[in-house]
C-alpha cells in the first residue's frame, strides 16, 4: 500500500477493509496487511435462519476459552493490542466465542453498514439505481468519498441516532465530531446485532443489496488497501460476506474484521463473526492485519 496521507477534517482517516485504536506514528511507513486467500465460496443473498430452541449447538469448547486463545494469538503478533470478540451461531443463537463483547471500539468503516441501512431505508421499498450503485461501492470497496456524501445527506449523527433506535443497539454512540463518521463507537455485541438485523429484519431488497456487496468485497479497497485480512484470509475455505474497518488517528490504530460466515450452501450466513481491535501506535498495517488473521484462524475448526 502506498503511504497513507493525513485526511482533511472531512476525511482525515486512513482505513483498511473490514469491522481497535492507538496513535499511528509515521503513517507513511505503513503498508497494507498481508493477504493470502485468493478466493472464497460464494453464495447468493438469503435470510439467515431464526434461532430455534430445538437446535443443539455442536460447540463443546468453552466460549471464553476460544476467545482467549484468539486474543493470545492476536497479542502475540501485535503486543499491547486490545481485542473485542463476539462470534454467534445465528441458527441457534449460541455464542461461539466472546471476550470484551460490551467494550466500545471505534467503528472505522464498519459504520458504513449503518449508513447503508439508513440510506436505503429512506428510499422505501426500492432504492433508485444511482443510490443502489453508491451503497454497493461504499460497502464492497469501502469507498470513503461515497460514505462522506451519504453521511452528510443523511444528517451526519442523525444516521446513528435513527439506526440505534431501529435496531435497538445498546452501546453505539455517534462521534463527537459530526464530520468524522469513523469515530462512531460501538461494541462487538452491537455489531452482531447489526448483522442480525440485516439478515432477519431489513426489507428483502435492502438485505440482498447489502449482503451482495459484502459477499463481493473487493480485495483492493477504493483507497488501495488490501481488505483481505482477518475473516477473508483466515476463513478462505468458507463462504463469507464482510465489512472491514481500519483507521489511523494520532492516538490509536483501529483494525476491525466483521462479517457473516457460512459452512454450507444452505446456510451461507450462519455465523456472525466480529473482531474489533485497538492496536499500539506505530503498528504497521502488515503486522496489524496478520494479527487479526492469526486470531480468526483459530475459529476455523469451531465453525462447522
Where are the language model's segments positioned?
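Penicillin-recognizing serine hydrolase domain
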Residues: 2, 12-15, 33-52, 58-83, ...
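Hydrophobic alpha-helical membrane segments, chiefly transmembrane helices and signal peptide h-regions
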Residues: 23-24, 28-31, 110-119, 271, ...
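Short, conserved catalytic-motif segment at the N-terminal edge
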Residues: 80-83, 88-104
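Short, well-structured active-site flanking segments
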Residues: 121-137, 142, 156, 206
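Acidic/histidine-rich, surface-exposed loop or edge segments in extracytoplasmic proteins
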Residues: 43-57, 94-99, 114-119, 140-144
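N-terminal export and membrane-targeting signals
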Residues: 2-26, 131
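Active-site SXXK
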Residues: 93, 104-127, 138, 273
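Glycine/small-residue-rich loop that forms an oxyanion/phosphate-binding "nest" at active or ligand-binding sites
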Residues: 119, 148, 152
